[in-house]
């Protein structure tokens, strides 16, 4: 009976496995899987539809077609379970065994597995140390390979053609053995003695780099074979497994035809060729015929395994390449990505969304019909429980007839049962949120307006999907973790996500504006009720300035109670009435201002930090209700008259046109080049456009009114368009500028700027030419959008893949390392304050007062708003905080190093998947930004070029240590250093610092006192000068026309300038660099003071020479100018690829050079086209590098440089930064560069997220010195693994291995993870699986992705606890288990005894009564 009951139990696979191993299958293993050999190519009988015996669908091998019924029908029903029918040989069992039973084909000749042959690098080639070409010739019967040379001078592994073979046979007879085809290769593989080979290779890791590399690779492979117990011979197959038939189905279509899986065709070909070959061999057919058949068999097996990898793909009847086994698992529609990582979900529906303004934040409107369908099982259960229906069938009928009781039950079932809403594309975790459903009529889902920002949803036809969490656990998680009212902050930046937008903002803004001399101005009210009555009776207007007595609630620090305090406040009617909805504990000053979108965001943020989540959600809902009401009352609309075109516009445009004419004039007379002309014209128009928009906004923003006392004053305008833009409800200055200013410069599709701007605006209307130019930009916007969305999605996918296994898995790793944080200052402006950078991080060491050195905060404190306010008061300007990069946790991160969970506002919880959050935070805006280009209609947005710096604050001037300058003949100071900075400090505290470029003219001196607004330095932004530091007479060297310089005659002007040309372009052999030497009055060469080197100033390619031979020059004079290329428009288009480039750690095109060590620069002998640059350090060690002459060298003879300093101009290579400056500097570089791109678009992302990704890029190390470990020098290993190995070695007193950091790009890092399942499901599936199978890899299932694929809970969030408990349970040995079981039994016995005594005493009590 028990066995019968077990039968109906749900079949659950034992999920107590900790790892999955992949390996090569031996022939014995394949036979052990098989249930019989497939001998015939037949599939099913076309008349009876029964499978043919011994065919590809044979019931005897694979199992019955109908449940518990044999093929001939002799045995039917459950009672014969397990019987094997003697007539048809079919076992009586469930038909689903046809999904798991395999067959096999015995190959008449061995066949090589194509993956190990053709997947690069060829594994067969590595093992045999033969070239792929040779192996292929042997395998496909074009050549012989010597398998046993015997006593002959032939070499084993050598290749010979047919003719050679015949000759050698006649020469040596049967002394040697040579074979063709896979047999030969198999013999060679089986003849390899792995131990001997590894010993030989270990001793041979010397010599040329190529050889060492190759030997190391071979060694690694052979060691893997040895370790995993896989024999190399198994790469050549003798037995081919056959997939279970239900996984390659054959379905009859109507009309007598069949739809079949391609695999059946491929198997059929293999079987046909195999049986033909077997017959030929039995008939002892001539060698040449058998050989051809063997080749064909090899090809058939190849295309079964991976069609199209070698030669032409096999095609079916319709000329379409057949889908082989490899195609089944790889790519977007393969097994991994289609079925394992992305599944379709039951209990789900989708519909259009509409707005539900009356909903609470945690609710959504669910159409009744949809709910009825989704909650069916729950309704059935209720119907049965109440006895309304007796069977499921009856319940179904009841539901379908739609009786009132069904709807009542539905209401009840839905109560407190959250559903999840998802809007595709789900770019971050706020793309799926849970809501409590409210049943509504109609067919559209209703969505709360405040969650639209998080979903990025609007109501122009968007659709959303609904999912029902079924189990109690799922409901609980949805309710506690995913409910919309629990997710009010963006995980990317920690800012509120439930900020109102559009009409709500407009309503709130309009109600909180103040109007000078409004109706009822100056009235004083006793309380808010009085204000409301005055407004209702039309005594005052909303925007009038009044005074009113308000009650504010402040939290008592000690008791935690709220205490009221009353005061008279000057405010406006609207603000006073709005104060009613403020949560307790938020001061009225937060609301006593015009509420723009930014202000509302700050208000909600302040509320969250001060009053907590619940109060904030309620507050946001009230804001929303009021905003809708007020914007309706306001009734703001726009008319064409609101677009005021500034009267100064014509004059500004006239001025610009005059300037452009002047530039054209200069161009015609040859003072500027064509490139400079274009740049200057674009610049003039850019500035003119900005000026027009400035005067336009000034005109829109202010209006003149008469105040109470009859004076004319200015107030902020009540112009509708201005109010919309100013409040942040809709539109921006850029759009208003196009309506009422001028459209300005447009960009071509390639990003270059069209130099004729559109001077008209939409209010005036465009003429045909202007319209035509407009279409350029607009089209670029749309094309961009389409292309970039895909790129951004791919970037997100790579980021998620590289970080998916990073989870917070301990509280504190105990490290004291960290990074120093200070405010980011550029051009004297604080771009990101220290506050923003350290908020929500943990201090790495005590924070001390800068002067008294008193400890303000101990190490390990989480910095929150209050703590930072305190530190800002004390004047702390740098703090060392813990970062994700310096965390010492293995296989994860610790909570302390990560700091605050930005999406929830407290310290991060254990089990939080911070890697995925980081990836989503960086990927999500990428998609956003790329979808946002077309709004401005392609109007060129270009960062105006700086040509000067001005002081932003008062103080005294000092220069940094690298600043060098000379005084020129006019007495101006000219900067001749590359990294000079002007520092303004006040009382010893640095206020600002500005970088000044080479060639700038300084207008201040050291220690000068300056006032804010003073110009400190200016320069020509469009050219880069080459300046002399010394005086003398110019003597050109190698300045020969046609050789190093060319006369550039301008087509327009006929004037000529000398321009330096690339010496590579001409035929002369000796390479010369055009340069200037200076001659003093005595006709001697001027020397660099303190050395005997002559002053030589080289010209770069492209420089325009400004001086003549023999001219006298003074210090600071310009010898030549190099024009700077025209600027492309900078938007995220340049930005997204830039982000991808940084995360892929690509070496930039013309990368700059960093100094390899600290020392003195000197220049050695020049070689062809290159300068030999040398650095000599204090110990006399010399490092040298050849630098191409056209590169801009930033240093000069005799200059002392520090390790890692830039010495040749160009973008830095992250690999160099890591090598020379270390991890912290690298992280700073990547974080800053990525942030620059996003900041340009006004997107806020916390630095943490970028650091998390950099941590993952640095997770592998390169072994340098192997010590006593089994590693090979130069091998890449996971950092955690080498740390574990080294600890084990040190415990045994052996020498640990040393290693150096290596930076991998995100794609590379994803593919080189220890988890082969994760890597295979990412990209290059074939290569990853091939490698893993040969290595016999184990996947420890640490990451999220691997666990999703094998169908377990992920080791993050609530799953982390589950996995830890499971591991702990597995770790308990049997003895402990027994002990616990005994204890429990004893306890149970005790309880029983207790129960007995208790029962007795109860009885006693009863009788005592």
UniProtKB/Swiss-Prot annotation:
EC number: 2.7.7.6
Pfam families named in the record: RNA_pol_Rpb1_1, RNA_pol_Rpb1_2, RNA_pol_Rpb1_3, RNA_pol_Rpb1_4, RNA_pol_Rpb1_5
Keywords of the record: DNA-directed RNA polymerase, Magnesium, Metal-binding, Nucleotidyltransferase, Transcription, Transferase, Zinc
Gene Ontology CC entries for this record: DNA-directed RNA polymerase complex
Nucleotidyltransferase in keyword set: yes
Residues at which Zn(2+) 2 binds: 813, 887, 894, 897
Family, as annotated: Belongs to the RNA polymerase beta' chain family.
HAMAP family cross-referenced by the UniProt entry: RNApol_bact_RpoC
Name listed for the protein in its UniProt record: DNA-directed RNA polymerase subunit beta'
């Amino acid at each position: 009976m028990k066995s019968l009951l077990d039968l109906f139990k749900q079949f659950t696979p034992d999920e107590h496995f900790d790892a999955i191993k992949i390996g090569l299958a031996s022939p014995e293993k394949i036979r052990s899987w098989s249930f019989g050999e497939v001998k015939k190519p037949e599939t099913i009988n076309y008349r009876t539809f029964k499978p043919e015996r011994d065919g590809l669908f044979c019931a005897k091998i694979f199992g019955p077609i109908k449940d518990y019924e044999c093929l001939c029908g002799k045995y039917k029903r459950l009672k014969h379970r397990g019987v094997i029918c003697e007539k048809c040989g079919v076992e009586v069992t469930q038909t689903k065994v046809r999904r798991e039973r395999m067959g096999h084909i015995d190959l008449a000749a061995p066949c090589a597995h194509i993956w190990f042959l053709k997947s690069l690098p060829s594994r067969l080639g590595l093992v045999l140390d033969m070239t792929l070409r040779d192996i292929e010739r042997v395998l496909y019967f074009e050549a012989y390979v010597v398998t046993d040379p015997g006593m002959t001078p032939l070499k084993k592994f050598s290749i010979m053609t047919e003719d050679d073979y015949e000759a050698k046979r006649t020469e040596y007879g049967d002394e040697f053995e040579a074979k063709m085809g896979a047999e030969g290769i198999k013999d060679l593989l089986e003849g390899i003695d792995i131990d001997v080979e590894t010993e030989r290779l270990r001793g041979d890791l010397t010599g040329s780099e190529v050889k060492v590399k190759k030997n190391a690779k071979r060694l690694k492979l052979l060691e893997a074979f040895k370790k995993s117990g896989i024999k190399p011979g198994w790469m050549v197959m003798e037995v081919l497994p056959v997939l279970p038939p239900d996984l390659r189905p054959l379905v009859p279509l109507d009309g007598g035809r069949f739809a079949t899986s391609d695999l059946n065709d491929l198997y059929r070909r293999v079987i046909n060729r195999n049986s033909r070959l077997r017959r030929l061999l039995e008939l002892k057919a001539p060698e040449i015929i058998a050989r051809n058949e063997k080749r064909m068999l090899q090809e058939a097996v190849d295309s079964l395994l991976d069609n199209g990898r070698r030669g032409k793909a096999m095609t079916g009847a319709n000329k379409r390449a057949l889908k082989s086994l490899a195609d089944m698992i790889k790519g977007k529609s393969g097994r991994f990505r289609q079925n394992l990582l992305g599944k379709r979900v039951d209990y789900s529906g989708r519909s259009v969304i509409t707005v539900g303004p009356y909903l609470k934040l945690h609710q959504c409107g669910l159409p009744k019909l949809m709910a009825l369908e989704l909650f069916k099982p729950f309704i059935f259960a209720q119907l049965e429980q109440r006895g309304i229906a007796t069977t499921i069938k009856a319940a179904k009928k009841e539901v379908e007839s739609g009786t009132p009781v069904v709807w009542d039950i539905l209401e009840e079932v839905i109560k407190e049962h959250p559903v999840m809403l998802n809007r595709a594309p789900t770019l971050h975790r706020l793309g799926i949120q849970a809501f409590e459903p409210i049943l509504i009529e109609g067919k559209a889902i209703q969505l709360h307006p405040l969650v639209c920002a998080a979903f990025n949803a609007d109501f122009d036809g968007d659709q959303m999907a609904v999912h029902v969490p079924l189990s109690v656990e799922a409901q609980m998680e949805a309710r506690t973790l995913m409910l919309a009212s629990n997710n009010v902050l963006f995980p990317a930046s920690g800012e509120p996500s439930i900020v109102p937008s559009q009409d709500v903002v407009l309503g709130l803004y309009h109600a909180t504006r103040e109007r000078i001399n409004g109706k009822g101005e100056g009235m004083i009210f006793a309380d808010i009720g009085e204000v409301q009555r005055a407004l209702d009776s039309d005594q005052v207007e909303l925007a009038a300035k009044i005074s009113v007595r308000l009650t504010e609630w402040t939290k008592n620090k000690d008791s935690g109670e709220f205490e009221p305090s009353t005061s008279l406040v000057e405010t406006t009617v609207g603000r006073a009435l709005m104060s009613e909805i403020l949560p307790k504990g938020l001061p009225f000053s937060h609301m006593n201002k015009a509420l723009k979108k930014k202000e509302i965001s700050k208000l909600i943020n302040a509320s969250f930090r001060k009053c907590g989540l619940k109060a904030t959600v309620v507050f946001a809902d009230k804001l929303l209700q009021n905003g809708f009401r007020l914007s309706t009352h306001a009734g703001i609309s726009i008319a064409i008259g609101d677009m005021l075109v500034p009267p100064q516009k014509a004059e500004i445009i006239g001025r610009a046109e005059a300037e452009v004419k002047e530039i054209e004039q200069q161009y015609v007379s040859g003072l500027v080049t064509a490139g400079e002309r274009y740049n200057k014209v674009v610049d003039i128009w850019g500035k003119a456009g900005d000026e027009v928009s400035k005067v336009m906004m000034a005109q829109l923003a202010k209006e003149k009114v008469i105040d109470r006392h009859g004076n004319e004053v200015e107030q902020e305008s009540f112009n509708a368009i201005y109010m919309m833009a100013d409040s942040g409800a809709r539109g921006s200055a850029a759009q208003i500028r196009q309506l009422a200013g001028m459209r300005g410069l447009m960009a071509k599709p390639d990003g270059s700027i069209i130099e004729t701007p559109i001077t008209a605006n939409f209010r005036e209307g465009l003429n045909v030419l202007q319209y035509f130019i407009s279409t350029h930009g607009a089209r670029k916007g749309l094309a961009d959008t389409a292309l970039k969305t895909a790129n951004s999605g791919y970037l997100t996918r790579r980021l998620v893949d590289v970080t998916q296994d990073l989870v917070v898995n301990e509280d504190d790793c105990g490290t004291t390392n960290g990074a120093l944080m200070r405010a980011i200052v550029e051009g004297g402006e604080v771009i990101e304050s220290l506050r923003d950078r350290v908020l929500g991080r943990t201090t790495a060491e005590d924070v001390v007062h800068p002067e008294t050195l008193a400890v303000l905060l101990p190490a390990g404190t989480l910095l929150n708003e209050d703590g930072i306010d305190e530190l800002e008061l004390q004047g702390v300007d740098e703090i060392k905080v813990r970062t994700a990069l310096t965390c010492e946790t293995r296989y994860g991160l610790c909570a302390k190093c990560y700091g605050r969970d930005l999406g929830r506002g407290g310290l991060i919880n254990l089990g939080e998947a911070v890697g995925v959050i980081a990836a989503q935070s960086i990927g999500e805006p990428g998609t956003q930004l790329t979808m946002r280009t077309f709004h401005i209609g392609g109007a060129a947005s270009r960062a105006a070029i700086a040509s000067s710096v001005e002081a932003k604050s008062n103080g005294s001037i000092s220069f940094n240590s690298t600043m060098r300058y000379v005084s020129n003949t006019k007495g101006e100071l000219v900067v001749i250093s590359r990294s000079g900075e002007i520092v303004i400090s006040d009382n010893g505290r640095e206020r600002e610092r500005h970088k000044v470029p080479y060639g700038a003219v300084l207008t201040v001196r050291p220690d000068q006192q300056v006032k804010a607004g003073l110009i400190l330095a200016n320069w020509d932004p469009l050219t880069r000068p080459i300046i002399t530091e010394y005086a003398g007479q110019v003597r050109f060297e190698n300045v020969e026309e046609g050789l190093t310089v060319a006369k550039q005659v301008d087509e327009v002007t006929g004037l000529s300038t000398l321009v330096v040309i690339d010496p590579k372009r001409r035929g002369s052999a000796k390479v010369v660099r055009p340069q200037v030497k200076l001659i003093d009055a005595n006709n001697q060469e001027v020397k660099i003071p303190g050395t005997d080197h002559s002053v030589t100033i080289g010209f770069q390619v492209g420089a325009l020479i400004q001086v003549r031979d023999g001219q006298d020059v003074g210090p600071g004079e310009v010898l030549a100018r190099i024009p700077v290329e025209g600027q492309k428009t900078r938007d995220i288009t340049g930005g997204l690829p830039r982000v991808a480039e940084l995360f892929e750690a690509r070496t930039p095109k013309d990368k700059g050079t960093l100094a390899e060590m600290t020392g003195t620069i000197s220049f050695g002998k020049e070689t062809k086209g290159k300068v030999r640059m040398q650095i000599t350090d204090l110990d006399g060690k010399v490092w040298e590098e050849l630098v191409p002459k056209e590169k801009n060298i930033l240093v000069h003879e005799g200059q002392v440089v520090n390790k890692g300093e830039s010495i040749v101009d160009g973008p830095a290579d992250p690999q160099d930064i890591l090598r020379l400056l270390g991890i912290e500097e690298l992280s700073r570089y990547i974080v800053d560069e990525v942030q620059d791109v996003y900041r340009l678009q006004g997107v806020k992302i916390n630095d943490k997220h970028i650091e998390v990704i950099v941590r993952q890029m640095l997770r592998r190390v390169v072994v340098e010195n192997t010590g006593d470990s089994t590693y090979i020098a130069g091998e890449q290993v996971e950092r955690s693994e080498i740390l574990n190995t080294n600890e084990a070695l040190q415990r045994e007193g052996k020498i640990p291995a040393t290693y150096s950091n290596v930076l991998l790009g995100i794609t590379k890092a994803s593919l080189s993870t220890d988890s082969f399942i994760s890597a295979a499901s990412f990209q290059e599936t074939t290569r990853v699986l091939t490698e893993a199978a040969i290595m016999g890899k184990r996947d420890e299932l640490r990451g999220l992705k691997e666990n999703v694929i094998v169908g377990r809970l992920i080791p993050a969030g609530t799953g982390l606890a589950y996995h830890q408990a499971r591991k702990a349970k597995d770790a308990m040995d049997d003895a402990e288990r027994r002990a616990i079981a005994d204890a429990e039994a004893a306890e149970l016995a005790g309880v029983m005894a207790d129960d007995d005594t208790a029962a007795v005493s109860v009885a006693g009590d009863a009788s005592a009564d």
